[in-house]
Amino acid sequence: MNLRSVFTVEQQRILQRYYENGMTNQSKNCFQLILQCAQETKLDFSVVRTWVGNKRRKMSSKSCESGAAGTVSGTSLAAPDITVRNVVNIARPSSQQSSWTSANNDVIVTGIYSPVSSSSKQGTTKHTNTQITEAHKIPIQKAANKNDTELQLHIPVQRQVAHCKNASVLLGEKTIILSRQTSVLNAGNSVYNHTKKSYGSSPVQASEMTVPQKPSVCQRPCKIEPVGIQRSYKPEHAGLASHNLCGQKPTIRDPCCRTQNLEIREVFSLAVSDYPQRILGGNSTQKPASAEGTCLSIAMETGDAEDEYAREEELASMGAQITSYSRFYESGNSLRAENQSTNLPGPGRNLPNSQMVNIRDLSDNVLYQTRDYHLTPRTSLHTASSTMYSNTNPSRSNFSPHFVSSNQLRLSQNQNNYQISGNLSVPWITGCSRKRALQDRTQFSDRDLATLKKYWDNGMTSLGSVCREKIEAVAIELNVDCEIVRTWIGNRRRKYRLMGIEVPPPRGGPADFSEQPESGSLSALTPGEEAGPEVGEDNDRNDEVSICLSEASSQEESNELIPNETRAHKDEEHQAVSADNVKIEIIDDEESDMISNSEVEQENSLLDYKNEEVRFIENELEIQKQKYFKLQSFVRNLILAMKADDKDQQQALLSDLPPELEEMDCSHASPDPDDTSLSVSSLSEKNASDSL
């Protein structure tokens, strides 16, 4: 039982800061952050990892309570944002409406908006103790008779704010981490939003969007509207100011020009997106939020505390394909909304020629700018369709023509619920790296373990080519990658070696469960005697190969894959070829069984014979004991008669000698009677002294 860890105030502050900067789950994507945090706090790695898990559960339980009060509102907003540590920059041309929701439920911001007098917030425009990061201006081709606008969020860097909760907001293709404050904020730490929106012909006046001084009960909740329904904004209720996309910085207007401002009290995020980059200028159809999106998502998971750990084990191995600081998410309902991009009528919505800005072209904030990452469509991680920046219509994108269209990539049916969570702060976990750091654990069910052990008993005990057919067969049966099966075999071999158990020799060919696996394991080596040393060398070599294969790149795995049709034909051929071998093995098994049975019978007969000998010796011992007692009584009586000098008694005893003495006298006649009498007399004296 582990003891509870007591953290100091400084350690709590460091842990909270790392949590805000992306250390939000226990997978390998946060391994570097957890390691750095452990070194900085001088705590053990497992202690920090346990703290992250406890933090996730606490935030998930709180989000379930607070998520029920939130309402779903808004339409679509597409923004490829760049997540840089401690700084969030958003720059996106958008002429849609000003709600915080993207096309495929990427971001559903539910908030409590209350009017606040603008005079009380004038002091917040000074930016005294804050660092406001300005987003990059992205030039976009303008369509005729259309207004292109730019949305800019200026979010201050707050490094030492106690008790912050992260609300992850997905906008477009990347992830923005907004901090939801529960402590009192000063006037300088404010979030400013200045844009310029033009809906039809009526401009929207400038206003200010600030974080409240203190969390309080809402005074006027926002209007509840279903997702996907266009909402007309009146000028007096709009909270977004704007400026043209000409490269100039946004002008902060006097907030006194407005009678009231909007104040954000709560920000929630529902991570139920599939392909955020498919949002082209807001021309998309949104579906109502499903039941999965009722909880706040912490660290880009489903928000379901019961299913969290099971999903994390499945998702951890997929993070190796993401090539920058990003988090992508997908769920089963997002696959149903893949190709439903339509044009919705409405003011500011008709932008058929709006372009997709690829995240790779923003060179100031993207890591690994000089490298070009090409991902293979078929990898063992099954994440090609969710890790590529693909577009629904390739002709609309002039920035990334080499990326594969999302129409060409599909997830298989058994991978609908797979999600990807990745914060790649280290370059060796990228998709093009030679090795994958920190191979994650695979949790098998009881049925899968029984299947693996059944194949193990049938001869799938080697990592070499001799067991390739069995490995492929069990991988297809369990619907897992061959590398996972090879890793399991290598781990089991090491376990056997550590426990002192001899690893069974491997058997080639397809698996055959018509016989007992133990009986065929020894006879599989009899057809070729020279196969013995090769198998031994293969066993020694496999222990090293098991480690290498578990870290091999996905490109090497894809080269080893065999199509199912050719694999089926190959299995049939091997079954036809190895039929004679199976018969020979059965005959050898019968002979070995006969030999073993005869040996057992021989040992049993030998044991019975030994038992008879023991019983015979025991009977002989009893007979000898009786003879000894008779001789002892005869000698005693004879000695007493000799001492009493009773001739008659002596003659009577000598006339009635025991038969043993008579036989002894006849067979052992002493040539010297004096010696015999002397020996008898000495024996009688000794017995007499013993009796006295």
Swiss-Prot record:
<feature type="cross-link" description="Glycyl lysine isopeptide (Lys-Gly) (interchain with G-Cter in SUMO2)">
    <location>
        <position position="234"/>
    </location>
</feature>
<feature type="cross-link" description="Glycyl lysine isopeptide (Lys-Gly) (interchain with G-Cter in SUMO2)">
    <location>
        <position position="174"/>
    </location>
</feature>
<keyword id="KW-0371">Homeobox</keyword>
<feature type="cross-link" description="Glycyl lysine isopeptide (Lys-Gly) (interchain with G-Cter in SUMO2)">
    <location>
        <position position="214"/>
    </location>
</feature>
<feature type="cross-link" description="Glycyl lysine isopeptide (Lys-Gly) (interchain with G-Cter in SUMO2)">
    <location>
        <position position="146"/>
    </location>
</feature>
<feature type="DNA-binding region" description="Homeobox 1">
    <location>
        <begin position="3"/>
        <end position="63"/>
    </location>
</feature>
<dbReference type="GO" id="GO:0005634">
    <property type="term" value="C:nucleus"/>
</dbReference>
<protein>
    <recommendedName>
        <fullName>Highly divergent homeobox</fullName>
    </recommendedName>
</protein>
<keyword id="KW-0238">DNA-binding</keyword>
<feature type="region of interest" description="Disordered">
    <location>
        <begin position="505"/>
        <end position="541"/>
    </location>
</feature>
<feature type="DNA-binding region" description="Homeobox 2">
    <location>
        <begin position="437"/>
        <end position="500"/>
    </location>
</feature>
<feature type="cross-link" description="Glycyl lysine isopeptide (Lys-Gly) (interchain with G-Cter in SUMO2)">
    <location>
        <position position="165"/>
    </location>
</feature>
<feature type="region of interest" description="Disordered">
    <location>
        <begin position="647"/>
        <end position="692"/>
    </location>
</feature>
<feature type="region of interest" description="Disordered">
    <location>
        <begin position="117"/>
        <end position="136"/>
    </location>
</feature>
<keyword id="KW-0832">Ubl conjugation</keyword>
<feature type="cross-link" description="Glycyl lysine isopeptide (Lys-Gly) (interchain with G-Cter in SUMO2)">
    <location>
        <position position="223"/>
    </location>
</feature>
<dbReference type="InterPro" id="IPR009057">
    <property type="entry name" value="Homeodomain-like_sf"/>
</dbReference>
<keyword id="KW-0677">Repeat</keyword>
<keyword id="KW-0539">Nucleus</keyword>
<feature type="compositionally biased region" description="Polar residues">
    <location>
        <begin position="117"/>
        <end position="133"/>
    </location>
</feature>
<feature type="cross-link" description="Glycyl lysine isopeptide (Lys-Gly) (interchain with G-Cter in SUMO2)">
    <location>
        <position position="137"/>
    </location>
</feature>
<feature type="cross-link" description="Glycyl lysine isopeptide (Lys-Gly) (interchain with G-Cter in SUMO2)">
    <location>
        <position position="142"/>
    </location>
</feature>
<feature type="compositionally biased region" description="Polar residues">
    <location>
        <begin position="676"/>
        <end position="692"/>
    </location>
</feature>
<keyword id="KW-1017">Isopeptide bond</keyword>
<dbReference type="InterPro" id="IPR001356">
    <property type="entry name" value="HD"/>
</dbReference>
<feature type="cross-link" description="Glycyl lysine isopeptide (Lys-Gly) (interchain with G-Cter in SUMO2)">
    <location>
        <position position="196"/>
    </location>
</feature>
<dbReference type="InterPro" id="IPR050255">
    <property type="entry name" value="POU_domain_TF"/>
</dbReference>
<dbReference type="GO" id="GO:0003677">
    <property type="term" value="F:DNA binding"/>
</dbReference>
